[in-house]
Regions:
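Short aromatic-glycine motifs in intrinsically disordered, low-complexity regions
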Residues: 1-10, 72
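Catalytic strand-loop segment that frames the active site of acyl-thioester-processing enzymes
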Residues: 10-46
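Hydrophobic core residues within well-ordered beta-strands of beta-rich domains
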Residues: 13-15, 96, 110
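Conserved positions in beta-strands of structured domains
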Residues: 17-20, 87, 101-103
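Extracellular/lumenal ectodomain signal focusing on beta-strand-rich modules
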Residues: 18-21, 83, 130
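HotDog/MaoC-like acyl-thioester-processing domains
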Residues: 28, 60, 91-92, 101-142
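Compact, glycine-rich, soluble single-domain proteins
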Residues: 42-61, 78-79
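Hydrophobic beta-strand-centered segment that forms part of the acyl-chain substrate-binding groove
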Residues: 60-99, 132
Length: 142
């Protein structure tokens, strides 16, 4: 599924190509890293790009969940990023794959765990980052 309507970012700053909802608590997103990506330095896609990809993946998943359950997408914010482990960088031509799992929902706060891996081909996938995030959904703009 395309994510362009689920996140506030617009080209050229979209860092998620596709999303597959696996269950109400789990999704998988992908991003093909292209030369034109604003967060690429030459052919290098580093920590800031990977973290932005994770954040947009989480936002797309929460937006999709909100749309399915409430019929609309609410504005939201990242409330916390913790335990961010950056293990390796990626390069143009690689595909980032991120698994997002909701661990807790308490009112307007959703806690997620994210695991991101990179592959240059289907048989060569390795982890590049993981973290925990808390996202706040702002329903005050009803």
């Amino acid at each position: 599924m395309k994510t362009i309507g689920l996140i506030p970012q617009r080209p050229p700053f979209v860092m998620v190509d596709d999303m597959e909802v696996i269950s109400p608590e789990h999704c998988r997103t992908t991003l093909l890293i292209k030369d034109a990506n604003l967060l690429c330095d030459e052919t290098f896609f580093g920590e800031s790009g990977v973290l932005e990809h994770i954040a947009q993946s989480a936002a797309a998943f929460i937006g999709d969940k909100s749309l399915r359950e409430e019929g609309r997408i609410w504005p939201g914010y990242i409330g916390e990023i913790k335990n961010f482990n950056f293990l390796d960088s990626a390069k143009t031509g690689d595909v980032l794959t991120t698994e997002i799992r909701i661990t807790t929902i308490f009112g307007d706060v959703t806690a997620i765990e994210a695991q991101t891996s990179v592959s240059s081909d289907a048989d060569n996938q390795h982890p590049v980052a993981n973290c925990v995030m808390k996202l706040f959904v702002d329903r005050s703009h009803a």
